[in-house]
């Protein structure tokens, strides 16, 4: 997929502590890479057939509201359970990161870093592009002002000790450090 294996190791360590059965208490996120249901269905629909998951990809449809659906409940459970299979989850995480990498590079006109990719995982692709463009223009801008919903849900990221709001550069640096530490803790080098 062209995505650095060390990045994927770091992401899995940060997201789940390398636990294939990890589940978020605040969302539908599950597995090594903590895919939420809609993100998982999207990446499986787009790339599943390339990796022997044609049966899954062809069972994922899109409703009039734009949400991805699987009409058969047992098939839906089987597709979502794949988030807990380390090989499948890693392949789909790599494909998802590769898609994000291409889009970020096209949008910013530079090579995407591992931290850029992690921002896309955290904020979604549109949010990451918005974050990165704003950070390049004004690194001292307060992150919570730009992403109020994300800040409410992730106060430890957007605010420091005593509720002090963090700048875009500070948030980015925290993610960079977190990703580097996660990768190093599982033996990855050179992020």
Residue ranges and their predicted role:
Residues 2-4, 26, 111-112:
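Extracellular/periplasmic catalytic domains that process cell-envelope and extracellular macromolecules
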Residues 156-191:
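Low-complexity, Gly/Ser/Thr/Pro-rich intrinsically disordered linker/tail segments
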Residues 19-21, 42-43:
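Short active-site-adjacent helix-start/loop capping segments
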Residues 3-19, 93-95, 117-125:
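Short, functionally critical alpha-helical segments immediately adjacent to catalytic or ligand/cofactor-binding
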Residues 20-32, 36:
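Peptidoglycan cell-wall recognition and remodeling modules
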Residues 37, 41-118, 122-130, 172, ...:
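Alpha-helical segment that forms one wall of the substrate-binding/catalytic cleft
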Residues 113-166:
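Catalytic and substrate-binding regions of cell-wall glycan-acting enzymes that process beta-1,4-linked
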């Amino acid at each position: 997929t062209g995505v650095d294996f060390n990045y994927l190791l770091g992401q899995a360590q940060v997201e789940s502590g390398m636990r294939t059965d990890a589940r978020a208490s605040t969302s539908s996120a599950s597995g090594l890479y903590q895919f939420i249901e809609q993100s998982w269905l999207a990446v499986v629909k787009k790339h599943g057939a390339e990796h022997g998951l044609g049966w899954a990809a062809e069972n994922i449809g899109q409703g009039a509201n734009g949400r991805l659906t699987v009409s058969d409940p047992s098939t839906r459970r089987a597709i979502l359970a794949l988030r807990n299979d380390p090989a499948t989850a890693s392949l789909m995480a790599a494909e998802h990161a590769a898609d994000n990498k291409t889009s970020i590079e096209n949008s910013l006109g530079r090579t995407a870093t591992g931290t850029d990719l992690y921002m896309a995982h955290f904020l979604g692709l549109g949010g990451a592009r918005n974050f990165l463009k704003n950070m390049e223009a004004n690194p001292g801008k307060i992150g919570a002002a730009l992403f109020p919903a994300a800040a409410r849900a992730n106060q430890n990221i957007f605010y420091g000790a005593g509720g002090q709001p963090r700048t875009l550069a500070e948030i980015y640096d925290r993610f960079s450090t977190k990703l580097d530490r996660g990768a190093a803790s599982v033996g990855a080098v050179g992020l």
